[in-house]
Amino acid sequence: LTSPHPHVVTNCITDLSIHGEVFDMIGLSRTPYNKINIHIGGAYGDKESAMKRFCENFERLPDSVKSRLTVENDDKASMYSVKDLYYGVYKHIGIPIVFDYHHHKFCDGGLSEQEALEMAISSWPTDITPATHYSESRREEQEDMSIRVQAHSDYVLNKIETYGNTIDVMVEAKHKELAVKKYLELHG
């Protein structure tokens, strides 16, 4: 939705619309609880203009998508931090932000982890538990410097810091349910 190319935006709207239709067909309520989570897309050399295009193109989406859409912070410094999304998207169109702990390490927008988490939390409706994503670096887990630092690890070994907030945490790890099982064995 940030693209300056109309055909790219049209394709994105078509794809998101299909997601919204499927969610409707299986009876999921139209709230961010049943989220369609996306990264907002490229910055195209001008983040402010790209976020403005995102907000304008958001209005072209059907209600089945608009009511469920959430946005997530990126893992590259040149892309979108929680702070960018909060002021450039949420403040204009009210889309909740899914905080990704691992991505924040690479694109912090000048905020601490706690500040970014709590900013993202504040974007959610009060009757829905905010969603977050948590992963750890595969490079650090494997102690292999040839692995991209942003790559997800097999397991999540560190205790997830919620800073006293009530949040839903989606674990992103290569070993999926086994990773969650191991985390619960380690941290309860």
PLM-predicted stretches and their roles:
Residues 77, 102-108:
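Short acidic, Gly/Ser-rich segments with clustered Asp/Glu that frequently serve as metal-coordination loops
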Residues 33, 44, 80, 86-90, ...:
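Sequence-level detector for tyrosine residue identity
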Residues 1-96:
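Active-site acidic/histidine proton-transfer and metal-coordination neighborhood
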Residues 74, 102, 174:
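Anionic group-transfer/hydrolysis microenvironments
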Residues 95, 106-188:
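Histidine-acidic metal/acid-base catalytic patches
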Residues 69, 100, 169:
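Conserved, mostly hydrophobic/aromatic
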